[in-house]
């Protein structure tokens, strides 16, 4: 004998089946889209921050690599400074330039200029060189072809460090006093005891280094 389900139980079963087959409502779909949009935005911002950080790290690494290379070059040059004056000849006459001639601020109008021995590895010759800060905020290296050169011979100029606001030098005299020009008196030796170089980068970092010179 078959047992028939009660009408109330049958209604509950039909309602449950309808509820299980019901799709998402519009509000649920919009809520899901909003959550997905927020997740995508957060992911995009996170990726952008990572890329920005990587670019900043690359820029800083390159900047300090260039600064380190410049200081290495400057140190090598000043430690090869030669206590040898040079003959200077121009259209107005001839004279002698001191072995080391320096001012406090090596700008476009002034510069650090000195005689330099040949490099020990034989890759360069004895010559007159100079450093100065040009109008483009670049430290320039000037290279003359030798020591005693022909009249009005112009040096080759090479930018060796960009993005420099300040390029200042001081020189240590035999009394262990820092002076702003060299030679500062007729009794000064051809080369100072040391040179102090202060650089301020365009990004505001300040670097000060002291280089002992060969006496």
Residue ranges and their predicted role:
Residues 1-2, 18-47:
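N-terminal single-pass transmembrane signal-anchor helix
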Residues 5, 11-17:
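Short, low-complexity intrinsically disordered segments enriched in A/P/G/S/L with frequent Arg
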Residues 24, 129, 195:
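Residue-level detector of short, conserved catalytic/binding motifs and their immediate flanks
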Residues 42-147:
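Extracytoplasmic beta-strand-rich oligomerization domains located immediately C-terminal to a leader/signal peptide
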Residues 122-125, 151-152, 162, 190-192:
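Short solvent-exposed loop/turn micro-motifs enriched in small/polar/acidic residues
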Residues 123-128, 155-157, 205-208:
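Short, mixed charged/polar active-site loops
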Residues 145-159:
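Short aromatic-glycine motifs in intrinsically disordered, low-complexity regions
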Residues 161-215:
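Short linear sequence signals and composition-biased patches located at protein termini or domain-edge surfaces
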């Amino acid at each position: 004998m078959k047992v028939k389900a009660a009408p109330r139980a049958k209604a509950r079963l039909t309602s449950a089946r309808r509820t299980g087959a019901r799709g998402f409502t519009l509000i649920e779909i919009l809520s899901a889209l909003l959550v997905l949009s927020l997740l995508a935005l957060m992911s995009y911002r996170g990726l952008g921050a990572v890329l920005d950080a990587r670019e900043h790290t690359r820029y800083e690494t390159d900047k300090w690599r260039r600064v380190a290379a410049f200081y290495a070059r400057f140190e090598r040059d000043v430690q090869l400074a030669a206590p040898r004056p040079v003959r200077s000849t121009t259209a107005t006459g001839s004279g002698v330039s001191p072995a080391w001639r320096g001012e406090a601020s090596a700008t476009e109008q002034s510069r650090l200029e000195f005689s330099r021995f040949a490099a020990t590895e034989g890759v360069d010759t004895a010559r007159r060189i100079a450093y100065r800060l040009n109008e483009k905020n670049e430290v320039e290296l000037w290279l003359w072809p030798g020591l005693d050169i022909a009249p009005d011979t112009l040096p080759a100029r090479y930018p060796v460090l960009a993005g420099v606001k300040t390029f200042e030098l001081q020189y240590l005299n035999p009394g262990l006093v820092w002076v702003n020009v060299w030679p500062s008196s007729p009794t000064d030796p051809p080369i100072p005891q040391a040179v102090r170089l202060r650089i301020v980068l365009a990004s505001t970092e300040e670097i000060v280094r002291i280089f002992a010179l060969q006496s």
